[in-house]
């Protein structure tokens, strides 16, 4: 972190601080801005931004208060949904995409229950050997002695393989799932990139809808399986979802993004963190039993989803500030996970941190991430297999991050492997 960025963060008038700027996360310069908000204004109002006026909630305690109160704070697309950027305005006849994450109760619970069995503990126990088999296959085929991009060869590859399994999607076309996941948040207000071809984005998302519609139709009349499409078809609340293009595309994209981003960017973030803190890396070499706790700490430290947005359904006092009905409230999970009042030495990755699981990366309350156990399982298995084969996954160049204020994505992690 440059001293210049810290000076800038301390000199800007409090009322003008805008932590939604995508370049803060691309350049990894967000820390001093959130440090200041947590200290001076954990509930902070910005009157004007690219995303309109909004409240920022930056402390761990107040984030949980908002996330846990779904009667006051709405996730519904009717009120603007879950991201600080309002959804793109659909053209005439265009599909917008709506999923259960952008619904309030009871609709949210009804549709969430349809796919929950896919990631239930009993089913995860059944697919654990498959995850391990695929992790081993990936690791055994990595180049040794030369540098390569860990994101492309490991993070993306493992999540693409698991996504194909979860959807029973054609395995040879698995990288389409990753591409469609990236498209889901590729809008200028989220990325800061005004050159995005929104027509091509829409056309490509329609290809995703078409591919999944064909997959849906191919499963009609087939024995029920534990893949996500079969689960949707065999639940009363979602059995006819294919007849509603908005809900169909929205639900598919939610499940793709949910199955991709947390795992993929935590796999990448873990390598970065362990290289930054080599003493912590040594701890898991000495005691691999720390890996499950390390996984929680990586997810805290990386925080794959930077924020979630809610909209106030009524006037509400939060942290001494008066929020009015209809106002946008943004929970900055990334900041909550660096709250020193909860996590001692919060900016450091500490693999045996006793309260690592207190992180808010998966959210809190009824919208808590449904696939959190699957993400943790994949990370645990991968690091168990890494430590059996490699003394070090060494970072050998500069990390490249994506410009995005919603997903804390990583594009390039150049590494070299050092076998045991």
Regions found by a protein language model. Name each.
Residues 1-420:
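Cytochrome P450
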């Amino acid at each position: 972190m440059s001293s210049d960025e810290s000076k800038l963060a301390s000199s800007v008038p409090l009322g003008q601080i805008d932590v939604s700027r995508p370049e803060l996360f691309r350049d990894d310069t967000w820390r001093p801005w959130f440090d200041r908000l947590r200290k001076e204004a954990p509930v902070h109002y910005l009157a004007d931004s690219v995303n309109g006026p909004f409240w920022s909630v930056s402390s761990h305690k107040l984030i949980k208060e908002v996330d846990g109160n779904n009667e006051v704070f709405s996730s519904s697309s009717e009120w603007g949904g879950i991201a600080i950027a309002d959804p793109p305005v659909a053209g005439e006849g265009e599909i917008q995409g709506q999923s259960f994450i952008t619904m309030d109760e009871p609709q949210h619970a009804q549709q969430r229950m349809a796919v929950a069995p896919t990631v239930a503990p009993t089913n995860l126990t059944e697919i654990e050997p498959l995850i391990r088999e695929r992790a081993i296959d990936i690791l055994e085929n990595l180049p040794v002695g030369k540098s390569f991009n860990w994101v492309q060869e490991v993070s993306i590859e493992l999540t693409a393989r698991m996504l194909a399994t979860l959807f029973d999607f054609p395995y040879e076309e698995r990288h389409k799932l990753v591409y469609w996941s990236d498209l889901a948040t590729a809008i200028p207000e989220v990325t800061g990139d005004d050159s995005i071809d929104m027509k091509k984005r829409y056309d490509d998302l329609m290809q995703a809808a078409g591919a999944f519609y064909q997959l849906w139709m191919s499963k009609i009349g087939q024995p029920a399986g534990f893949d996500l499409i079969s689960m949707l078809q065999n639940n009363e609340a979602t059995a006819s979802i294919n007849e509603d293009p908005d809900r169909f595309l929205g639900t598919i994209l939610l499940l793709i993004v949910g199955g991709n981003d947390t795992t993929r960017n935590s796999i990448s973030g873990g390598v970065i963190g362990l290289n930054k803190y080599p003493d912590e890396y040594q701890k898991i070499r000495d005691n691999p039993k720390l890996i499950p706790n390390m996984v929680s700490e990586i997810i805290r430290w990386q925080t794959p989803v930077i924020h979630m947005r809610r909209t106030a359904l009524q006037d509400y006092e939060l942290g001494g500030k008066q929020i009015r009905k209809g106002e946008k409230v943004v929970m900055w999970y990334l900041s909550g996970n660096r709250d020193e009042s909860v996590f001692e030495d919060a900016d450091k990755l500490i693999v045996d941190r006793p309260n690592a699981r207190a992180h808010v990366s998966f959210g809190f309350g009824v919208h808590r991430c449904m696939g959190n156990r699957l993400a943790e399982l994949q990370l645990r298995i991968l690091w168990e297999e890494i430590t059996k084969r490699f003394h070090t996954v060494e970072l050998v160049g500069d990390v490249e991050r994506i410009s995005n204020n919603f997903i804390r994505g990583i594009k390039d992690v150049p590494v070299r492997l050092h076998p045991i």
